[in-house]
């Protein structure tokens, strides 16, 4: 059977609850029930964190960040001012630094969301999310599913990633874009209907 990355989303909570107690106590503090924060992480006093949550080493959680639970945040990440996370995995070196909402999503290594860009995780008609490409529609069985970002994805400021968006590695999304469906790896998403493959520099 095919296996898709969004199948992980309903399992994030249980994974964190299983992993958290095994983290080395010389490197992590359980600052409150089911919230494990690396000693080398920097968390602003004004940040709000609800468990279960793991914040890994050398990550920065800035002023008024809001982590609503089921968040696995990797090493060297930035969770910025007024950014909200819920049921997410952020791989190492991810940056969501300014006014971002990331819900029911997975962000790959070194991906970056520009200021004000968000993942929209529920369809307006409240139906189950379907991932659509040019050739097929994949039923996810999920009511809440934001986006899957590959490694080194750059999302421009003010963009909306609609429910069920999948962006391949090394792709760029123009600012103020409304993105849906599958964006191939190595692409530049300019607007709906205009997605170009990056030119390889020799």
Residue ranges and their predicted role:
Residues 1-34, 170, 176, 185-187, ...:
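Terminal amphipathic alpha-helical/low-complexity segments used for targeting or macromolecular assembly
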Residues 90-92, 97-202:
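Glycine-rich hexapeptide-repeat left-handed beta-helix
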Residues 54, 84, 190-192:
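A generic structural signal for ordered secondary structure
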Residues 37-82:
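Glycine-rich active-site/cofactor-binding loop and its immediate structural neighborhood
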Residues 27-29, 41, 65, 77, ...:
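Short, functionally important structural connectors and interaction interfaces within domains
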Residues 27, 31-33, 51, 63, ...:
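Short, conserved secondary-structure segments in the cores of folded domains
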């Amino acid at each position: 059977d095919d296996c898709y990355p969004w199948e992980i989303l309903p399992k994030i909570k249980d994974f964190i609850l299983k992993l958290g107690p095994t983290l080395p106590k010389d490197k992590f503090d359980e600052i409150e029930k089911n919230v494990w924060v690396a000693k080398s992480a920097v968390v602003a006093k004004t940040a709000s964190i609800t468990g279960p949550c793991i914040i890994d080493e050398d990550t920065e959680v800035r002023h008024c960040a809001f982590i609503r639970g089921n968040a696995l945040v990797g090493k060297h990440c930035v969770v910025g001012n007024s950014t909200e996370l819920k049921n997410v995995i952020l791989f190492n070196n991810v940056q969501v630094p300014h006014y971002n909402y990331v819900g029911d999503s997975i962000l790959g290594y070194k991906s970056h969301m520009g200021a004000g860009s968000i993942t929209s995780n529920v369809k307006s008609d409240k139906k189950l999310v379907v991932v659509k490409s040019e050739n097929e529609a994949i039923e996810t069985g999920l009511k809440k599913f934001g986006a899957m970002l590959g490694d080194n994805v750059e999302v421009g400021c003010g963009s909306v990633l609609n429910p069920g968006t999948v962006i391949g590695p090394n792709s760029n999304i123009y600012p103020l874009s409304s993105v849906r469906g599958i964006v191939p790896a190595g692409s530049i998403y300019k607007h709906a209907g205009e997605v170009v493959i990056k030119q390889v520099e020799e």
